[in-house]
């Protein structure tokens, strides 16, 4: 969620020097190593997890009751000769699909066609996918050979940020890079291909992955499959929505502060943030903060993906004795409010674990979250100069306000005044907190918390107060101390929803989000298991314990009506709405603690600065939504959108409380993203134009790490940024 890093620990830019390196050869060498990557299954650690995937492989039906759209842009149905239905596909895990392909009961090409058809039909509502590569994916599926790949022929969606695939869009969320494509394929992506996945497209994310929601100005808002009135999370929001909606069984993501686990919690999917340095192709972010991995619908698939991408051969098998106490807390590490629903989710998990014979001990949260996050934001702001670097390379001039969203601009201006000494001090303090956490794990091997403090917030809530947006527009007029305080203050509203995820990244520890809870409004909520470095398998065993005992609780998404043309709105018929009043559940105990610390947050008037450009919330102008196709959900009044259960939801009490102070006046007109949802899917000529480097041209390259992951602009000359003295 909220931080960007560079390959250097300090990244305030004053000048550059170019260092020529054989980048392409290095990447090639790394990629060649992935071909020998095999699935490592430790017997002791995998027995419980294997049990969760031991059910019979989905039976191949001879019925074709689900009409599958052709992958071609004409939208015709797949031939009736196909015996594998869309329903079969949506119910199957990635491992089951690979087994079917291996046993020749279905072809990878058929699976890809189904995945493309679902995506093109349902994406106009969710805006989870930003590009499709139909022709390439079908060609790769047809040519696929079985060499023992664990995910043979399984369709996969790739996160659009930080995971380069040669020839595909590589914008980092910047409008001025809308035509840029990757000049090479990253090691992580190559490893996914070597594992047998067929990449069918790329998923939505916020600009540079800064946020815990995906509300990109360029691509629009990625919304939640369980209720499109709510966010899908960030920064891997498109990935979470794609998996929850069964576009694909697994989508790749990246996590530098919760960017896998936050969407997992809010979309009812499984999200693992692996330990520092154990996954192939991990970024070179400072202290290994960013990791690349994926989201899935089952712990079994997550475990198989982990073992496939694992590079550390001596990782412990993982074992949690019932004699070892498990710690739990529902306290926010920063003292911010936590919803009653999140507390209930943890309480249910505690009761289940006690029934299984484990000892549970309630503790105070061992981390000083306010102190940790101030260090976190120092590191983030110190690396925002990457936006200026890219603007200079592409536009041949310094970065200007209109080039980027408001948050990127504010971080860039703040970063100019952050010295290398400040960044070093921040990391030193983080290391001290990590040491204290390591000592905690000596007594309690597991810490159980909510993954997020509440269910997904409403898309009417930009998670930015209007007075903060106004101050950010003039941030260059503030002192360095005032700038840093503003960065902390403006992020506090968003951080209040997700205070539990950042420590795992900064400390290098693994963390697993498992979807065990569904609110009365039908929105998912995850619980999070945290442990010490390299104890990933222990976490996966705990997740498997919940899965094997049917404690994975995911909302049900109704199948579309096959007898009529799909409605891109995703709304049920209004006359069937049992409760369109929008009133909150009267029986639900309100949580009035959703307000941030009033001593730290200026009073939110709710009125925008009329003279200021709206913030970079990524939300479309409501007055234009029904007139254009530029909003996240076309032709829809987003204040009147019932959920899929047929009722208007009020969201969590925490959501209501924060909405009351933050959702007025900060609607952004910046969210006129470049591609309408309808034109984006199924009409390749309207996707970003692919501009490849000329043969023999030396293309500048940089390897910067953001909250959402690492991005490699292209291979060529690497520019190393000097830090301010």
UniProtKB/Swiss-Prot annotation:
Protein name: Lipoamidase
Positions of transmembrane segments: 700-720
Protein transport in keyword set: no
Activity control: Lipoamidase activity is slightly inhibited by p-chloromercuribenzoate.
GO molecular function terms listed in the Swiss-Prot or TrEMBL record: hydrolase activity
Compositionally biased intervals (Polar residues): 28-40, 662-679
PANTHER family given in the database record: GLUTAMYL-TRNA(GLN) AMIDOTRANSFERASE SUBUNIT A, MITOCHONDRIAL, TRANSAMIDASE
UniProt keyword list: Cell membrane, Hydrolase, Membrane, Transmembrane, Transmembrane helix
Compositional bias (Low complexity): 9-27, 650-661
SUPFAM superfamilies linked to this entry: Amidase signature (AS) enzymes
Active site positions, chain numbering: 159 (charge relay system), 235 (charge relay system), 259 (acyl-ester intermediate)
Catalytic activity: N(6)-[(R)-lipoyl]-L-lysyl-[lipoyl-carrier protein] + H2O = L-lysyl-[lipoyl-carrier protein] + (R)-lipoate
InterPro entries reported in the protein's UniProt record: Amidase, Amidase_CS, Amidase_dom, AS_sf
UniProt-reported outcome of changing residue 159 to A: Strong decrease in activity on the lipoyl domain substrate and on lipoylated small molecules substrates
Key word DNA-binding present: no
Further comment found in the protein's record: Expression of Lpa in E.coli is toxic as it inhibits aerobic growth of E.coli through inactivation of the host 2-oxoacid dehydrogenases.
Top EC group: hydrolase
Sequence ranges of Basic and acidic residues compositional bias: 556-637
Pfam family, one: Amidase
Coiled coil: none
Main location: membrane
Entry's EC annotation: 3.5.1.138
Topology relative to the membrane: Single-pass membrane protein
Family of this protein: Belongs to the amidase family.
Protein species of origin: Enterococcus faecalis
Gene3D superfamilies noted in UniProt: Amidase signature (AS) domain
Localization per record: Cell membrane
